[in-house]
């Protein structure tokens, strides 16, 4: 890690996305720990690493990591991943002190980025608000959700991902949602191996809508009439 950092605004969108999530995570974990909620802090870190960093960012950027030569694109990918790992080590230090210290020391031994010999002697991460892009986070979350649903449908009907499909029909609620999905369209199509995507405004005849009462929320408020209310809800038409 001897090269200068690639400027944040010059990094690819997917790098800026994971850095946005990372800074949101710093903010959340700092708040949880200040309020003596280590369990919520630990879960937030776990969700970030498993759902976003490992299952999405690293997997989608394998070609960038493996490409020959040290281009700015490859350097940006490695620097972004390193920043995430080092920051996660610092965030988890109060919760998992030994593993966090091992991860931090392994990273520092390879790069010499810090002059301390333990994660517990380093400063706690600081959130960079200017790097948080909620619109970008929302778009990527839609890409993850849609991709997950399509892959689940493939498994349900036993159609393997390696078999390309012609078109993916996506119902949208409004123009904002349509624009958000359009921005990550190519990513979704690549992830689920579909050639094209069409947006559906009127889902009549295509989707079967079902409504199910949330007993946990409705029960305390409508306990005495909950049974009748549930029956009325389930009898609602698709319109």
Language model features with spans:
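Feature 926 captures the class I aminoacyl-tRNA synthetase adenylation module centered on the KMSKS loop
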Residues: 1-239
């Amino acid at each position: 890690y001897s090269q200068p950092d690639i400027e944040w605004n010059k990094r690819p969108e997917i790098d800026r996305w994971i850095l946005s999530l990372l800074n949101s995570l710093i903010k959340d974990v700092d708040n949880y720990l200040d309020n003596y909620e280590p369990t919520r802090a630990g879960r937030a870190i776990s969700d970030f690493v498993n759902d976003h960093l490992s299952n999405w960012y690293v997997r989608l950027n394998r070609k960038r990591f493996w490409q020959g030569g040290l281009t700015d694109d490859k350097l940006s990918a490695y620097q972004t991943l390193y920043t995430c790992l080092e920051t996660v080590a610092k965030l988890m230090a109060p919760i998992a002190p030994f593993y966090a210290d091992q991860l931090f020391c392994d990273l520092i031994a390879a790069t010499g980025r810090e002059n301390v010999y333990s994660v517990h002697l380093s400063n706690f991460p600081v959130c960079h608000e200017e790097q948080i892009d909620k619109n970008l986070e929302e778009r990527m979350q839609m890409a993850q959700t849609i991709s997950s649903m399509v892959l689940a449908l493939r498994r349900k009907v036993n159609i393997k991902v390696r078999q390309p499909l012609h078109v993916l029909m996506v119902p949208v609620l409004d123009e904002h949602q349509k624009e958000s999905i359009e921005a990550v369209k190519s990513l979704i199509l690549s992830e689920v191996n579909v050639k094209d995507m069409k947006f559906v405004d009127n889902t009549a005849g295509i989707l079967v809508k079902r409504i199910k009462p949330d007993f946990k929320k409705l029960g305390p408020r409508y306990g005495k009439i909950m049974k009748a209310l549930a029956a009325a809800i389930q009898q609602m038409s698709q319109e």
